[in-house]
Curated annotation (Swiss-Prot):
Regions annotated as coiled coil: none
Matches recorded under PROSITE patterns: RIBOSOMAL_L29
Protein name: Large ribosomal subunit protein uL29
Alphabetized NCBIfam families for the sequence: L29 (TIGR00012)
Protein family membership: Belongs to the universal ribosomal protein uL29 family.
Amino acid sequence: MAKIKARDLRGKKKEELLKQLDDLKVELSQLRVAKVTGGAASKLSKIRVVRKSIARVLTVINQTQKENLRKFYKGKKYKPLDLRPKKTRAMRRRLNKHEENLKTKKQQRKERLYPVRKYAIKA
């Protein structure tokens, strides 16, 4: 089997990807048997290509699955932890923009009664 490109895999359905994954795993097991029995050098070098192809197929499956989950949870109040933006612990606990701008009644009254003085300078 030739080297598989990820862009070719992205257009396929999940069933096709799973079938291709099974085929690649079967091929890998056959190549490993050939390695033990003393197979040709071409078969031995093919093991690496097949392993990388399996990784590509699994990557595409996982990425599409995560993308679908993102679409499903878009606009919902709660999201799974792995779909939330990755930030530091301190950044997650920080006040949001709205909470930072809130003022107490006392503070609002003080600002209203004693506004900032503006001075005009005579040239």
